Amino acid sequence: MLEIQIIRDQKARVISGLKKRGFSDERLQILDQIINLDDQRKDVQTRLDSLLSERNSLSDEIGNLFKQGKAKEANELKSKVQSIKENADSLDQQLKSTISDLDGLMVTLPNIPHETVPEGKSAEDNKVHQAWSGKLPILPEGSVPHWELAEKYNLIDFKLGASISGSGFPLFRGKGARLQRALVNYFLDQARNEGFEEIQPPLLVNADSAYGTGQIPDKEAQMYYVGLDDLYLIPTAEVPITNIYRGQIIPEANMPVKLAGYTPCFRREAGSYGSDVKGLNRVHQFDKVEIVWIEHPSKSYDTLKLMVDHVSMLMDSLELPYRILHLCGGDMGFTSATTYDFEVYAAAQQKWLEVSSVSNFETFQSNRMKMRYRDANGKTQLVHTLNGSALALARIVAALLENNQSANGIKLPKVLVPYTGFEMID
């Protein structure tokens, strides 16, 4: 959630940022509504504080009068205190209503794009931050997409997964399952080598956690909800891992906080259809290793580069062609201040598939979660939060199968062999 003080003090920047996200002049009127409600909140709070202060003073005076044996005067003041209490209760209800209205508007505002975010309305306007400089794979005649390879080598059973759960829930088996486990372990080892603490978080979260990272209310329709227990299946490990520090004050000396975790991820992907959803291209359940970084505001953009470099290292080590896109304002996620997407090239499909998003949220998440740090002077300030996929497995597996196929089978990258125990799928 945006900080209200930023809306008040940097209104021109907020307007410019929201326009970059596609806000019309009519939609921008919400800013004046927010400021007016905040003015009302301050006014009601001031009047309420004044009444409460007066009530406390009168209560002390009543106590002193009773001690002095002046019961008549004390009882007269008690009736005045009762009147003040009724007025204070009324103001308290008014304050709660105003805050509720204010919060209802605030949660509809997305994060303000960083000044470097490209202009644009949709994915077509994203800018290539780093193009693939090498040659794209040239496949032998008769090469097929990964879903056919998965069937040929008995790696993934899409039909059985659909029979058990529904479409979009692939069942990995044999070397397919071992490849999944190998990738998870490899990615976690690389994160640990970079100083990330490994976390194994819950797969179900409550509404407060989903709200804290921004999934609620923006992405609620894309989440699986367990109504009997009022819990949500996580769409990404970002949600439970970032919430580890919800409501906490982190000593500045303990920063940065670097966390990494593997989880299955669950996404409804409502409205998805067509060739882009075939095989592993778009599924409802997939495995992912996530890295989360909690950082001092002055260092977060240097940190963002380190996270992008980490994901680049993983892609290079897997010997996969990839490119990095800088998302435009119109395609960026609700909570993000800036996002870099990694896309892998799947040679049999001749498509670029997203396998990672690395984002800086600045104070958007930490403001919702009341996550702060305490500086050397004892002052508390909001931290910056960042996260990235390092990596999402489904499309990585798709690219590994497609790009490395030959007449003899599928050869795996060297870095994975110690984890799989085999170098060929045949």
Segments from the language model and where they lie:
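N-terminal alpha-helical targeting/anchoring segments
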Residues: 1-136, 155, 159
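TRNA-recognition modules of translation machinery and tRNA-sensing kinases, especially anticodon-binding
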Residues: 23, 27, 131-426
